[in-house]
């Protein structure tokens, strides 16, 4: 049995959960999220607490039920508080700008790279070098942040590139040269 799956998901009165045949819909002050459910997972709600239980004891089902509990918990946190990822641009001349809802990055290429913000994601820029991605879906916020970082990941010699705020980049020594 999954240790995470056994834990209940507690939510406030601001959050409403509705279970259809194959879906769970979580509504809160920041928005609404939906998740398709497996037939092998049983979900019960009792006084603002959600319980996830496996229907059978098959190994695949036991692996899934902890994952479902974690995803539903992330949905509850997302519709109440939301999620945020911060990226920083390091390098001479590296800067970010907003053009409407799109993000334009100047990161050493001959042209600016433009990223369109999908629905449900807000992108903000601080001091031209910090990009803030926020939204209610933890998965989508993380995926967009990862896509932006992959445009110019930090290189190991000088550390130039796009990185998460607080990310440690291991640096290499340059070549020794002639003596």
UniProtKB/Swiss-Prot annotation:
Keyword Transcription regulation attached: no
Cell location: Plastid, Chloroplast
Chief location bin: plastid
Single Gene Ontology BP annotation: cytoplasmic translation
GO molecular function: rRNA binding; structural constituent of ribosome
Keyword Ribonucleoprotein annotated: yes
GO cellular component, one term: chloroplast
One family name in Pfam for this protein: Ribosomal_L6
Keyword tags: Chloroplast, Plastid, Ribonucleoprotein, Ribosomal protein, RNA-binding, rRNA-binding
PROSITE patterns assigned: RIBOSOMAL_L6_1 (PS00525)
Function statement: Binds 23S rRNA.
Assembly with partners or alone: Part of the 50S ribosomal subunit.
Family classification: Belongs to the universal ribosomal protein uL6 family.
UniProt name for this protein: Large ribosomal subunit protein uL6c
